[in-house]
Design a protein with these regions (language model features):
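Conserved alpha-helix/loop element of class I SAM-dependent methyltransferases that forms part
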Residues: 27-64, 78, 82
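Class I SAM-dependent methyltransferase SAM/SAH-binding core
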Residues: 61-129
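A short acidic, Gly/Pro-enriched loop at the edge of an enzyme's catalytic core
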Residues: 128-139
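A short SAM/SAH-binding and catalytic strip from SAM-dependent methyltransferases
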Residues: 138-151
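A short glycine-rich, Lys/Arg-flanked "PGG" loop and its adjoining helix->strand segment in the class I
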Residues: 153-168
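Short, glycine-/aromatic-enriched active-site segment of Class I SAM-dependent methyltransferases
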Residues: 175-195
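Short alpha-helix
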Residues: 197-212
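C-terminal lobe and adjacent flexible extensions of AdoMet/dcAdoMet transferase-like proteins
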Residues: 211, 217-223, 229-395
Length: 395
């Protein structure tokens, strides 16, 4: 199918939903009871998403927020509440019917919030060519939309263009664990259902890094659907457009605290837990972003850690037999690859089969935020305990 055919089919699907209230298959999590206090019912009826509200927990008063694929405006109106009357919200959408609903209800939502006028503007446009000024946005949000775009890498480059240096995105979307085959890619209906259009997680993130984003990490992920053996996940990711690097005041070394024994960051720098590593200004800037900062110590002089140090982070597997239950783990970030204390090497976006002992480690607080989990066994397992290797070690 051509890009034009895909775009037209998706637009018609959402236009029909706007007119009829048709439900589109996306795993939503809106708190409608709260939203009804200021969002009109007409908007709530045409609200679809896969992670809700996408990224708005980090909004600060007075910021400018962009919603890609704003639909009827639900996330824009929630953003409006959070940025306050001094902030600004821009929503872009390609479907006239959705834009009409959003524009019609903007003054109502503003009045319900007690604002003198609406601080939300809805613009018609494509995600691959956004009608938004360069460097004008503090936060980009998007809710189960980018996977519908035929040219996702263009979308990521557009996101980078419109963000201010130091800006960030938080987007929820559908990704797959394996490549989506051609017979699904050419299924128009499944494009509208966020399935045929899904990228593998690794390809999704690599497109963002290629556009210039760093510090890309998971906020949450949940299994969604399985079609012909392909698992689809709903995932929410955050990343940053770092400002120009400046020489840090005194920081010359970084020491990995854990919980991994080794990691490689998005700039290709390798670290071993407890061992100081010389770093440049750009790396220091990256390691100061929220996903990295708790895991590193930055110092003027080399700083080593021992396992007895309270700053050392580790979660060791139990020394017991394990069970293979069909569980797979996918590293989601912010590292390119990592190694745990049982010598498993995880690469971002690549599923790795794990046993029950490793699953318990990855479900711990220190590890959970870095992984998406799927199960391929559908409950059909033997449950037999085994020693994973001749030495009794795991896997």
């Amino acid at each position: 199918m051509s890009n034009e055919t895909i775009t037209q089919a998706v637009s018609e699907r959402y236009a029909r939903a706007a007119a009829t209230g048709e439900q589109i298959c996306c795993p939503t999590g809106y708190n409608f009871e709260d939203l009804r206090t200021f969002v009109p019912e007409e908007v709530l009826k045409v609200s679809y998403g896969c992670g809700t509200p996408a990224g708005l927990d980090t909004v600060r008063a007075g910021e400018t927020v962009l919603d890609i694929g704003s639909g009827g405006g639900i996330d824009c109106f929630e953003a409006s509440r959070r940025v306050g009357p001094t902030g600004r919200v821009v929503g872009i959408d390609m479907t006239d019917e959705m834009l009409a609903i959003a524009r019609r209800n903007a003054p109502i939502a503003a009045a319900n919030l007690g604002y003198a006028s609406s601080n939300v503007e809805f613009r018609k446009g494509m995600a691959e060519a956004m009608p938004v000024e360069d460097g004008s946005i503090d936060l980009i949000i998007s809710n189960c939309v980018i996977n519908l775009a035929p040219e996702k890498r263009k979308v990521f480059h557009e996101m980078f263009r419109v963000l201010r240096p130091g800006g960030r995105f938080t987007i929820s979307d559908i990704v797959s664990e394996h490549p989506v085959p051609n017979y699904l890619n050419h299924d128009v209906e499944k494009w509208g259902n966020c399935l045929s259009s899904a990228l593998q997680l690794g390809d999704y993130v690599s497109g963002m890094i290629e556009a210039g984003f760093l510090g890309i990490h998971q906020i949450r992920s949940i299994p969604w659907q399985e079609i012909d053996g392909i698992h689809f996940l709903s995932i929410t990711l955050t990343g940053y457009k770092l400002p120009a690097a400046v020489e840090p005041n005194g920081v010359r070394f970084a020491t990995l605290r854990g919980p991994f024994s080794q990691v490689v960051d998005e700039l290709g720098q390798r670290y071993q837990r407890g061992v100081p590593q010389a770093v440049n200004a750009r790396t220091v800037q990256l390691l100061k972003t929220p996903p990295f900062e708790p895991l590193f110590l930055l110092s003027e002089t080399p700083l080593s850690l021992e396992p007895s140090d309270a700053r050392w982070l580790a979660v060791l597997p139990e020394q017991v037999p394990c069970v293979w239950r069909g569980d797979y783990a996918m590293l989601t970030g912010p590292f390119a690859d990592v190694e745990d204390d049982d010598h498993h090497v995880f690469r971002r976006g690549s599923p790795l089969e794990i046993c029950s002992k490793t699953l318990k480690v990855l479900e711990s607080d220190l590890y959970r935020r870095h992984f998406a989990m799927i199960n391929r066994a559908a409950g059909e397992i033997s449950g037999s305990q085994v020693a994973c290797s001749p030495t009794g070690g795991c896997c």
